């Protein structure tokens, strides 16, 4: 069993999964979505849930630096509700994702020397991995589901 990390954007959802023991997070893919037309890629998430044997979802919560919640927090919470409707037996938790995209950009530029064009293609995957790894490192409540 694994946990799935999700970085919900307005056009894509970055997906990561944990190893079966809950020690590390790995990037999986980016799912295109269209919020305006209510296309959320839930069918693709369902395929990945089955393939990866997902036991819990960890959704990034993009709070503002002053800890207030803006429209992107609402979008992440809405995505959580969609997952809850589709997968009522799989628990959901949220992880503060402040600065994960900034950290992902820094890592891609400084450490991996990735071009800007390629960054746009992988940034959400990397951010989803950072979100899930942070959750695993702090031993969020769903980590016990893996044991």
From Swiss-Prot:
Q: Which SMART domains match?
A: YqgFc
Which PANTHER family does this UniProt record tie to the protein? POLYNUCLEOTIDYL TRANSFERASE, RIBONUCLEASE H-LIKE SUPERFAMILY PROTEIN
GO BP terms in the entry: rRNA 5'-end processing
Annotated family:
Belongs to the YqgF nuclease family.
Where located? Cytoplasm
Protein's name in the database: Putative pre-16S rRNA nuclease
Q: What is the lineage of its organism?
A: Bacteria, Bacillati, Bacillota, Bacilli, Lactobacillales
Enzyme class (EC, first level): hydrolase
User: Where does it sit, as one GO cellular component term?
Assistant: cytosol
Per the UniProt entry, what species is this protein from, by scientific name?
Answer: Limosilactobacillus reuteri (strain DSM 20016)
Question: What domain of life is recorded for the organism?
Answer: Bacteria
**Record function comment:** Could be a nuclease involved in processing of the 5'-end of pre-16S rRNA.
């Amino acid at each position: 069993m694994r946990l799935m990390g999700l970085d919900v954007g307005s056009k894509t959802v970055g997906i990561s999964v944990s190893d079966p023991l809950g020690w590390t997070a790995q990037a999986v893919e980016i799912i295109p979505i269209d919020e305006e037309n209510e296309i959320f890629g839930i069918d693709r998430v369902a395929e990945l849930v089955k393939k990866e044997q997902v036991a819990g979802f960890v959704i990034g919560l993009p709070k503002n630096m002053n800890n207030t919640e803006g429209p992107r927090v609402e979008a992440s919470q809405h995505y959580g509700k969609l997952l809850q409707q589709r997968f009522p037996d799989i628990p959901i938790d949220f992880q503060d994702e402040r600065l994960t995209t900034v950290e992902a950009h820094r890592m891609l530029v400084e450490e991996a020397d990735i071009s800007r064009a390629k960054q746009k293609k992988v940034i959400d995957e990397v951010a989803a991995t950072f979100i899930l790894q942070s959750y695993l490192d702090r031993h969020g409540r769903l980590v016990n589901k893996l044991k």
